[in-house]
Curated annotation (Swiss-Prot):
Residues 70-97, 175-196 are annotated as: Disordered. It comes from Homo sapiens (Human). PANTHER family: MITOCHONDRIAL RIBOSOMAL PROTEIN S31 (PTHR13231), SMALL RIBOSOMAL SUBUNIT PROTEIN MS31 (PTHR13231:SF3). The keyword tRNA processing does not apply. It is found in: Mitochondrion. Residues 183-196 have a biased composition (Basic and acidic residues). Keywords: Mitochondrion, Ribonucleoprotein, Ribosomal protein, Transit peptide. GO terms for biological process: mitochondrial translation. Residues 1-65 form a transit peptide. Pfam families: MRP-S31 (PF15433). GO terms for cellular component: mitochondrial inner membrane; mitochondrial small ribosomal subunit; mitochondrion; nucleolus. InterPro entries: MRP-S31. This is Small ribosomal subunit protein mS31.
């Protein structure tokens, strides 16, 4: 006979979660009341709370001491749970390291994302990695989808030079300048795109028309046409097509002799037209090519005559000088035209210089010289008020 084991451990109340193997609740639920009065073994009903047979722990003994044994499967589950927890911890560490490496390798360009890459002063550091990831996600979400062309290196260098010259924070100043320049570039690009008319291919195709030339096709020579043999069997309807394809030429066939042949073939007289400038220049070039050097004085005189240099014999140096019919002294002695000017003073001195220059000018006629002196007389008469203020007499 075996004595009844009256020692029981406290049991956990019934819950929805299954009991893990090797836990104190499972061992407590597996305690049984052993009796051998009727030769049978009785189990406590609380031992049936576990869902699987492997989780049931059986305890047997020949005395008041309780003997407990664990299944091999429970030991394996504990080892696997430890391994899974360790693998999860290692995966978390690896993911954190990967995220840190990605964040370090990321470079947010100023042209694609309008975010300040430099840390502004008096800003607290981020508390956790999640905050940095959230900010980067927001920046990429609100970033413009279309690609913006980066600024030229000359503008970037100029902005950095301006930032270095200012007493403020260099990085923030440079980023602000570059953002302003980028905004200006975007506005100008948008204006250019708005000015460009949008080409619609459907409108172009709808407006297109097939141009058909009104001119007849080039007439082919009859000898170049393909001529079939006389014994060739014609199919029905070929005669009509041949009649349509035949072309009549006014210069072939039998003449009717209605018009006179000589009157038709006589060419119309060409009208005399003056040679063009290019023809004259070409004739001069031909003459210079064929021209030989002058051998005597007569040939030289002939050449001068062709050039318009005519000489009178005996030689007179004043030939053609008296075209207006004036004498020689009238060209030189011009003091008689200065009677209305003052006898002395700056005006008299100025007019004497004018007459001296006119007397030495062989290209002006006497009439032109007198008109020149009269112009000065009228000019000084108009400026009498100014001359009086300057104490200059003009009588």
């Amino acid at each position: 006979m075996f004595p009844r084991v009256s020692t029981f451990l406290p049991l956990r109340p019934l819950s929805r979660h299954p009991l893990s193997s090797g836990s104190p609740e499972t061992s407590a639920a597996a305690i049984m009341l052993l009796t051998v009065r009727h030769g049978t073994v009785r189990y406590r009903s609380s031992a049936l709370l576990a869902r699987t047979k492997n989780n049931i722990q059986r305890y047997f003994g020949t005395n008041s001491v309780i003997c407990s044994k664990k299944d091999k499967q429970s030991v394996r589950t504990e080892e696997t749970s430890k391994e899974t927890s360790e693998s999860q911890d290692s995966e978390k560490e690896n993911t954190k390291k990967d995220l840190l490496g990605i964040i370090k390798g990321m470079k947010v360009e100023l042209s694609t994302v309008n975010v300040r890459t430099t840390k502004p002063p008096k800003r607290r550091p981020l508390k956790s990695l999640e905050a940095t990831l959230g900010r980067l996600r927001r920046a990429t979400e609100y970033a413009p989808k279309k690609r913006i062309e980066p600024l030229s290196p000359e503008l970037v260098a100029a902005a950095s030079a301006v930032a270095d010259s200012l007493p403020f924070d260099k990085q923030t100043t440079k980023s602000e300048l570059l953002s302003q320049l980028q905004q200006h570039e975007e506005e100008s690009r948008a204006q250019r795109d708005a000015k460009r008319p949008k080409i619609s291919f459907s409108n172009i195709i709808s407006d297109m028309k097939v141009a058909r030339s009104a001119t007849a096709r080039v007439r082919s020579r009859p000898e170049l046409r393909i001529q079939f043999d006389e014994g060739y069997d014609n199919y029905p309807g070929q005669e009509k097509t041949d009649d349509l394809k035949k072309r009549k030429n006014i210069f072939t066939g039998k003449r009717l002799n209605i018009f006179d042949m000589m009157a038709v073939t006589k060419e119309a007289p060409e009208t005399d037209t003056s040679p063009s400038l290019w023809d004259v220049e070409f004739a001069k070039q031909l003459a210079t090519v064929n021209e030989q050097p002058l051998q005597n004085g007569f040939e030289e005189l002939i050449q001068w005559t062709k050039e318009g240099k005519l000489w009178e014999f005996p030689i007179n140096n004043e030939a053609g000088f008296d075209d207006d019919g004036s004498e020689f002294h009238e060209h030189i002695f011009l003091e008689k035209h200065l009677e209305s000017f003052p006898k002395q003073g700056p005006i008299r001195h100025f007019m004497e210089l004018v007459t001296c220059g006119l007397s030495k000018n062989p290209y002006l006629s006497v009439k032109q010289k007198v008109e020149h002196i009269e112009w000065f007389r009228n000019y000084f008469n108009e400026k009498k008020d100014i001359l009086k203020e300057s104490n200059i007499q003009f009588n």
